[in-house]
Structure formats: structure tokens, C-alpha cells
A protein has these predicted regions:
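Acidic/polar loop patches that form or flank catalytic/metal-binding clefts of enzymes
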Residues: 159-163, 186-188, 265-269
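A short, polar/proline- and glycine-enriched secondary-structure boundary/capping micro-motif
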Residues: 141-146, 197-198, 276-277
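Polybasic low-complexity intrinsically disordered regions
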Residues: 7-180
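A short, flexible helix-boundary coil/loop motif
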Residues: 233, 238, 263-280
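Membrane-interface transmembrane-helix boundary segments in multi-pass integral membrane proteins
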Residues: 244-252
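Well-ordered mid-protein domain cores that form the structural environment of catalytic cofactors
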Residues: 1-2
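Helix-centered, glycine/charged polyanion-binding patches within enzymatic domains
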Residues: 167-168, 172-241, 245
Length: 280
């Protein structure tokens, strides 16, 4: 009944069901790929600005991974028999690394892997709204999508002047890109930048000491919290579909829901509690 009321339908009129939504999503993907969903995300950001939501100068960029909708062991057996993989777009990627000690007590670094995809996103630190995103296979490096996210943010006219991200974005080309676009650099530096002795060491030390860098690093955690909400409450930890474009569909719908929840809180002071069903 609430859905019928929202759509302006009479009590005795038929409401749309899951098959209607499936057909709708399929038609949009066939006609315009993901452009419609990207425009919808941008429209929500535009409406937020129109309603007076404050956007700060700091943007946080990061990626999160989603496990492919594949039984890896069964898939490997199928491929050994000459069959195609269930999801040809998914790939192995590095989830993270951790320190262990071997039998002799010497420290070693081990990597943890996943099979699936990545969502790369940019979030405004003050508003807590996701302003742009793109998706990739799990083996793609994070820094490869940084410039695309920045350009998408700037195209929306957001009052951004600083970008922060973890060490995966410590790429000389990205530092130059930010400088060329007159943006402050708060990308977390790898230790070797300031530990090595060369003529460039002072440049990196000066960057680390800057107010914009320090503020960006302090607030970088916020996007990890947003990703945690996406996985915990909206099922982004695992792909609902097969294929990159359908994974991107899941990511856009999840980001849209996260933004709408955030807007309700910012404009009405009403929080959403409990685990929601995945929307994609």
C-alpha cells in the first residue's frame, strides 16, 4: 500500500512487481548502458545542492571489492573440462596484506586475495554523499580510475579543492594531475618518498607538513565507513549478477540508496535503522 500511495495508484490498481523492475533495468542497460544511472546519481547530488546541503572542499577517493557470484572451485573444474568461465569479467585481485612470522621468527608479508570486481568511488567529506563512481575487474589498480572520478566531480561544479586517498593513489602522475588542475594534494605518501635521500625528498616532506594534507589524512576513514554500510546493510560485499556492467548497475543503485538515506538524515534528521534488503 505505501508503494501504491507513493506512485499515485488506486487501491484496486496493480502495483509493479519484481518482474517489472527487472524489465526496466534490462531496457535501460540495452538502450544507454549505464548513462541513465550515472545521470541519476548526479541528479541526486544536484538536488542536494539545491536543497541547501553543504558540500565541503575535501573529496575522499577509495575502492572496495565485491566477491563474484561464482563458486570458484566448481568454475575451475568447468574450465579444466574446456568450458568457459561463469563470469569472464571477474578476476583475482589483492584484498590486502598482513604481517606474519615464519618458523624462524622472521617477519613476512602475506597477501589476501579475492575473486570479483571493484567499485571506485569519490565521496564528499562534509556531506557524506557519493558524487561519482566507476567499476572495474578485481585486478585493476586503484590509481587507474582516480582522474576519471576527479573529472566527474569537477564537471558537476562541486566546490572541491582537495583530494585524499590511501597509498594506492601515491602515483607521480596523479600528484602532477592534481597540481595541473589547481587542486590540493592529500594523497597518502608511501614511506619511501621521505626516507630516501634525493633532491625530491624536501618536496614530499613539505607536502606532508601542509594543512591540507594533514586534514585529508585525518578524514580519509569516512569513505571506509561508507563502504562498510554498503556491504553490511545493502549486500555490496557480493555481486548479485554476472558481468561487469551488471555489477556496475548494482554499485550505482547501492550508491543512490546510500545518498538518499544520507539526504533524509541531513534534511529531516531521520535515521534509517536495521538491515535493508539489497536494492539491485
Amino acid at each position: 500500500m505505501p508503494a501504491k500511495y507513493f506512485l499515485g495508484l488506486g487501491v484496486d490498481e496493480k502495483a509493479p512487481d519484481h518482474t517489472t523492475l527487472t524489465a526496466f533495468k534490462k531496457r535501460i542497460l540495452e538502450n544507454g548502458k549505464l548513462a541513465a544511472y550515472e545521470q541519476l546519481l548526479q541528479e541526486i547530488v544536484r538536488l542536494a545542492v539545491e536543497k541547501g546541503v553543504k558540500f565541503g572542499a575535501l573529496q575522499i577517493v577509495d575502492s572496495t571489492h565485491s566477491i563474484a557470484n561464482v563458486n570458484v572451485q566448481q568454475d575451475e573444474r568447468r574450465q579444466r573440462k574446456g568450458q568457459l568461465p561463469r563470469d569472464s569479467g571477474a578476476s583475482w585481485g589483492v584484498k590486502g596484506s598482513y604481517k606474519v612470522r615464519d618458523e624462524e621468527g622472521k617477519p613476512q608479508e602475506r597477501r589476501e586475495y579475492f575473486y570479483g570486481y571493484k567499485m571506485h568511488a569519490s565521496m564528499n567529506a562534509q556531506s557524506g554523499l557519493i558524487t561519482s563512481l566507476c567499476c572495474s575487474s578485481g585486478n585493476r589498480p586503484d590509481n587507474e580510475y582516480f582522474c576519471r572520478l576527479v573529472q566527474a566531480d569537477l564537471a558537476q561544479g562541486l566546490p572541491v579543492d582537495t583530494y585524499t586517498g590511501d597509498r594506492a593513489y601515491d602515483d607521480s602522475e596523479l600528484h602532477v594531475f592534481l597540481q595541473a588542475n589547481h587542486l590540493h594534494d592529500a594523497l597518502k605518501l608511501n614511506d619511501y618518498r621521505t626516507q630516501k635521500k634525493d633532491v625530491h625528498k624536501g618536496v614530499w616532506e613539505e607536502l606532508q607538513a601542509s594543512e591540507h594534507y594533514q586534514n585529508g589524512i585525518r578524514q580519509r576513514y569516512q569513505i571506509e565507513r561508507k563502504f562498510g554500510e554498503a556491504k553490511r546493510e545493502h549486500g555490496l560485499g557480493r555481486c548479485r549478477y554476472v558481468g561487469l556492467i551488471r555489477y556496475a548497475l548494482q554499485c550505482f543503485l547501492t550508491a543512490i540508496v546510500l545518498n538518499l538515506k544520507r539526504l533524509v538524515w541531513l534534511l529531516r534528521g531521520v535515521p534509517f535503522k536495521g538491515r535493508a534488503r539489497a536494492v539491485a
